[in-house]
Design a protein with these regions (language model features):
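Conserved class I S-adenosyl-L-methionine
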Residues: 1-45, 59-63, 81-84, 88, 141-187
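Class I SAM-dependent methyltransferase SAM/SAH-binding core
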Residues: 51-53, 57-101
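A short acidic, Gly/Pro-enriched loop at the edge of an enzyme's catalytic core
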Residues: 100-111
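A short SAM/SAH-binding and catalytic strip from SAM-dependent methyltransferases
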Residues: 110-125
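A short glycine-rich, Lys/Arg-flanked "PGG" loop and its adjoining helix->strand segment in the class I
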Residues: 125-140
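Short alpha-helix
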Residues: 200-224
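Core SAM-dependent methyltransferase catalytic element
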Residues: 216, 238-259
Length: 259
């Protein structure tokens, strides 16, 4: 199904605050974890045509253009984010568009780039097929999402302690068992984006993800589970230590299979 309307409404309502947070580098998860990993795994972009899917308020497009891309187009389902993007980066082409129905000719782009967008979709298959259609032969789709292990972890918090638990507690010699987390099933959950913004996204196990890649005509050529950058260690030690051992994001690099 298309992006949940409640997600669109939430991003429209908080578009200015969201955009500010993207630009002031206060989101350490982006700055020291997700963004270096996805940018570091981009292919060569000289003279390439690029689509930014879920471009938000447009910040990533300047970087992609600086790598030599010939044409960079950004799309997002949020009208307010696209409005901010057009104000901020008037030299770029921004459009309000649903990822499941990409309104471009066949084989139009060399690369489709998407940062932390796909997990807002209940089903990826229609979007994957739409992306495949607009990619040129051997074109690349690179995107990041919340890691399914991380979204499967159960959260426990009180005033003093914040815990993230996965596994089970088996009470010996009884039928009692406590299970923490749920990896193998697909379900909707709330995700904290910022102080102002909590939206729904969707957990799905890796087995479903891989099957949808195959069904939509893609070959998986790389998978990255990034650790936090070492530059964050001194200033954000807890963040750095957690993300040396526990994955929060995953980057997929797919290639359109030759016809």
């Amino acid at each position: 199904m298309p992006t949940d309307k409640s997600i669109i409404d939430a991003y429209n309502k908080h578009a200015r605050a969201y955009s500010k947070r993207q630009r002031d580098n206060s989101n350490i998860y982006r700055v020291y974890l997700e963004r270096p990993a996805i940018f570091g795994n981009l292919p060569k972009l000289q003279e390439k045509d690029v689509l930014c899917l879920g471009c938000g308020s447009g910040e990533e497009m300047e970087h992609i253009k600086s790598l030599g891309a010939k044409k960079v187009i950004g799309i997002d389902i949020s009208e307010k984010l696209i409005e901010i993007a057009k104000e901020s980066y008037p030299n770029f082409d921004f459009r309000v568009m649903d990822a499941e129905n990409l309104d471009f000719p066949k084989e139009f782009f060399d690369l489709v780039f998407s940062s932390l967008t796909m997990h807002y979709l209940e089903s990826w298959l229609k979007t994957l097929k739409s992306v495949n259609r607009v990619l040129k032969r051997d074109g690349i789709f690179i995107f990041s999402v919340t890691h399914p292990f991380f979204s499967a972890i159960q959260k426990k918090e009180d005033e003093q302690i914040k815990s993230r638990i996965f596994g089970y507690k088996d009470i010996k010699n009884t039928a009692d068992i406590e299970i923490y987390g749920d990896y193998l099933n697909s379900y909707r959950l709330d995700a904290f984006v910022s102080k102002e913004l909590t939206v729904s996204n969707y957990h799905r196990p890796l087995s479903i993800i891989i099957k949808e890649f195959i069904e939509s005509g893609f070959e998986l050529i790389d998978l990255v589970e990034p650790k936090a950058q070492d530059e964050s260690k001194d200033k954000y030690y807890k963040f750095w230590a957690i993300h040396q051992k526990i994955p929060e994001f995953m980057i997929f690099k797919l290639k359109k299979k030759g016809q």
